[in-house]
Amino acid sequence: MLALLTVGVALAVAAGRAQDSPIPGSRFVCTALPPEAARAGCPLPAMPMQGGALSPEEELRAAVLQLRETVVQQKETLGAQREAIRELTGKLARCEGLAGGKARGTGKDTMGDLPRDPGHVVEQLSRSLQTLKDRLESLELQLRTNVSNAGLPSDFREVLQRRLGELERQLLRKVAELEDEKSLLHNETSAHRQKTESTLNALLQRVTELERGNSAFKSPDAFKVSLPLRTNYLYGKIKKTLPELYAFTICLWLRSSASPGIGTPFSYAVPGQANEIVLIEWGNNPIELLINDKVAQLPLFVSDGKWHHICITWTTRDGMWEAFQDGEKLGTGENLAPWHPIKPGGVLILGQEQDTVGGRFDATQAFVGELSQFNIWDRVLRAQEIINIANCSTNMPGNIIPWVDNNVDVFGGASKWPVETCEERLLDL
């Protein structure tokens, strides 16, 4: 029994020494694994290398694995490039829709949208194309470097070079197409802009002609001033000013259906007194005549949308005044700014009440409607003269302010149009 135990110990010691000693003339090499093998958890066994040199099969396997890694990297890069091309193509499609009028709207630009301005669209496309070119050049340089450093067999290098060449040509064709589309978009945008500018210039010229009163009226006084909106910027202005007056008569034709109140048909302001002469109806108040900021209420009713002839007389002596509508005297009074002469050198405005000389209009007091035949005399007209003017028996222009085309300017969208004849206005009463 003791002999058997001794023999077993000796065999165990010999086996341990045999395991510790390396195999003479042998060593191991580590081989790169493909991703599939790593994921499967089945690594290839280490291959013993005899004499310190790789066999042709082992060299080919290592080259194939390195080529596979390179191809995987290039696929990822090409995928990013394709995504960039798809993104740029989508932007071009939206841009074409914008240039063709398919993407009209008033919405704000949001994240990812093309800018509304065609100039910004072209600029953004230029930047995108330049970025794509830079990335393509970087990709080409990287691919060539990888191929030159791979040490692959000549057949593999030729195949890879051909595929890279095809890919490069495809990308260059796509870039050329994008550049052509960008150029076409730029040309269409420029043509559309020129057409728009031409239309706007023609419209501006027409508006200027209307503002200057260049429309062909039958006679210098055969026009009306239209003030269609209650704003603080539509008005007419009489070029001439008033001299110092101790009496006056102001007559005009007007038509308005504004409510509440027709607003201010005319106002005359001088330095230090914005309400030197004002005719106004605002809110639910009756029509008022202001002279030197003193007020008289007039029994006139003209907000029915029909033409009406209005005349107002005033004299500084006792501040006497009269009010006529359609040739009929409807009211009279006194003590309206008595012994106060009308100051000269002021500004006469149609359609707005002035808070300062020539300005600071209030939209709530603006006149809405049409005005014509605004005349001023430096005396009190007789009742029969006013009747004759109202029933079209006579045409008597004012000796201080006559109603003539070249003496009236319009601003802010107010316009001058041919007016109905006096007889047509009478039929409208």
UniProtKB/Swiss-Prot annotation:
Binds 2 calcium ions per subunit. SUPFAM superfamilies: Concanavalin A-like lectins/glucanases. Residues 221-422 form the Pentraxin (PTX) domain. Its cofactor is Ca(2+). GO terms for molecular function: carbohydrate binding; metal ion binding. GO terms for biological process: associative learning. Glycans are attached at N146, N187, N391. Likely to play role in the modification of cellular properties that underlie long-term plasticity. Binds to agar matrix in a calcium-dependent manner. Homooligomer or heterooligomer (probably pentamer) with neuronal pentraxin receptor (NPTXR). This is Neuronal pentraxin-2. It comes from Mus musculus. The lineage of its organism: Eukaryota, Metazoa, Chordata, Craniata, Vertebrata. The gene is Nptx2.
